[in-house]
Amino acid sequence: MNAGADAVYMGGKAFGARQYASNFDREEMQKAVYFAHMHRVRLYITVNTLVDDSELGELADYLLFLSNVGIDGIIVQDLGVIRLARQIVPDLPLHASTQMTVTNSEGVKLAAEAGMERVVLARELSLEEINTICHGTDTEIEVFIHGALCVCYSGQCLMSSLIGGRSGNRGRCAQPCRLPYKLVNEAGEDLLSGKDAGQYLLSPKDLNTLDILPQLIEAGVTSYKIEGRMKRPEYVAVVVDAYRRAIDSYLGGDYQVPEEDFANIEQIFNRDFTTAYLLERPGREMMSDRRPNNRGVLVGRVVKLDKAANKATLKLDKELHLDDGLEFWGQRGWSCWHYCDITFWQNGQEVAVAAAGFAGHYRCAAWH
């Protein structure tokens, strides 16, 4: 909220698609509603898993609580949840989750007829398709503009159930797409051996739309969604702040994104970035096959490495401080990780901060 969000979505202890997050109990939710509304921010709750018959009684009680506590709306996937909500809490606004896989204007119309005030479109649509949908309906349209992507269609995945024994459609995704795999033929031979390919064949890059945000605004999108659950508060604050300022600069008639904002977003977390389906680039360009987690930012190069002396000669492009984390990569595929807990040396003197342009030595406890 402090970073400029107009609305926040979060999950409760049940029926949300992030069951391994800490989430909010009912008392915490009441406090969150009060806090959000005090700051004139809307608060939406995810009720976006598939629901069993045995859970309908619990769900009905939960929906009544959400309505009574003053939630501004719920995000839903299951058709049964929609019907039940319309019956017992008809005034509670409903938003169609991206997992409802709405991909065209007729789907938006059907969702509206079912009582949806807003539709979160499938993440696989292009800018042109989003434009067509927005101009063909009066229903509010929401799209994801930043965050993790799923290798399966709008998150509808059975891999987690088959490989990890945990259902991604029930909020318990084990993220098997972030694991290493090999592509082999019938003889078991690695088809990608020796080629320019990493091990993480199913791991997508992160979505980043700062470069094309004006086009999304001009397409008529109502709401811009940033994926942030199970992310650190610092990540959410940095990303929301950057997009808030970007949107405001567009509305002010002069769209600019400072290089500092690009750098901050890249540094806080990235698997490398892509515009993916929005610019119709769904192939290898959107995959992060070399690593499935935060890759950090390039800060410089190793000019010389002396493993015996635990010393590296560095040429830095960015400033480094003590306690920064460094990951070293070799041309032959090896890598190692260090925290900057040993000082830098420049011209025979210890320095606590290595500025951009630094050319000197970095010592660590051991290389491995």
Locations of regions flagged by a protein language model:
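Surface-exposed amphipathic alpha-helical tracts and adjacent flexible/coil segments at the periphery
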Residues: 1, 7-9, 14, 39-46, ...
